[in-house]
Amino acid sequence: MTKVVVTGAAGRMGTQIVRLVRATPGLAVSGAVERAGSPAIGKDAGTLAGGEPLGVAVVDDLAKALAGADVVIDFTSHEASVRHAQACAAAGVALVIGSTGFTPDAKAKVAEAARKVPVVLSPNMSVGVNVVFELVRQAARVLGDGYDVEIVEIHHKHKRDAPSGTAVRLGEVAAEALGRAPADALAYTRHGILGERPPWQIGIQTLRGGDVVGEHTVFFCGEGERVEITHRATSREQFARGAARAAAWLPGKPPGVYDMADVLGLRGGK
């Protein structure tokens, strides 16, 4: 039985993950963590998730929950995820990170922790989205420089980072497939008199409103035709399912940074 600690256990994603982990054969919730001062501290993680008690009380310090754990699932913030990665590295516990908004410095700190333990770092745990990453890669390679690439994403009004980590990753995938440096190619939310669109540019536009779980469309705009690849998330459950799948796959892997393509076998695994 793989023992799983869930951070952010009282949040929207955390409660979904607790429910999915307890329903997944071979996985068990062994720990639950929330921020200091949360009203969830001391409460049962199973009850908070809307189910029967698990006998797992929510604590305010990840280190307290790591004893005997095999893997941590972390959907919090990139700042908290860095601290959690460092705690997991110190304890020798694998880590699945679904947080977004990572800065280069934060990613470097996660990579440093991954020198000691295996880490899955993915901006989107959905199986469907990770298939879309591969479809975009293939489309960019086949269509080439004759098609302009644009990305539009929309999420609920409570999402704090923009653009989404998934939109950025879609842009990176397209840029890499076209032989462009993502740092140079990606352009965000245009405004003003900018002149003609540079042919090497990949635009990313952000929308926020309502209760939209998540939608991403990649446009390949050519002369006389347009190809669109779209993914629509209608429930957070599919993110939790992907995270549970990653948690079952990761323990026992060599230290290093993995992503969902590795988990799903979409390319040669590490």
Curated annotation (Swiss-Prot):
EC annotation?
A: 1.17.1.8
Q: Could you tell me where this protein is found in the cell?
A: Cytoplasm
Keyword rRNA processing: yes or no? no
GO CC, any one term:
cytosol
Its biological purpose is as follows: Catalyzes the conversion of 4-hydroxy-tetrahydrodipicolinate (HTPA) to tetrahydrodipicolinate.
- Per UniProt, the enzyme's principal EC class comes to oxidoreductase
Chain residues that bind (S)-2,3,4,5-tetrahydrodipicolinate: 156, 165-166
Sequence positions that bind NAD(+):
8-13, 34, 98-100, 122-125
Q: What phylogenetic lineage does the species belong to?
A: Bacteria, Pseudomonadati, Myxococcota, Myxococcia, Myxococcales
Catalysed reactions, semicolon-separated: (S)-2,3,4,5-tetrahydrodipicolinate + NAD(+) + H2O = (2S,4S)-4-hydroxy-2,3,4,5-tetrahydrodipicolinate + NADH + H(+); (S)-2,3,4,5-tetrahydrodipicolinate + NADP(+) + H2O = (2S,4S)-4-hydroxy-2,3,4,5-tetrahydrodipicolinate + NADPH + H(+)
What name does UniProt use for this protein?
A: 4-hydroxy-tetrahydrodipicolinate reductase
| GTP-binding as UniProt keyword | no
Residue numbers annotated as active site: 155 (proton donor/acceptor), 159 (proton donor)
Report the record's Gene Ontology biological process terms: diaminopimelate biosynthetic process; lysine biosynthetic process via diaminopimelate
Keyword list (alphabetical) reads: Amino-acid biosynthesis, Cytoplasm, Diaminopimelate biosynthesis, Lysine biosynthesis, NAD, NADP, Oxidoreductase
> Gene3D superfamilies annotated for this entry?
Dihydrodipicolinate Reductase, domain 2, NAD(P)-binding Rossmann-like Domain
> What NCBIfam families does the entry give?
dapB (TIGR00036)
Q: Which residues cross the membrane?
A: none
Q: Please, which domain of life does this record's source organism belong to?
A: Bacteria
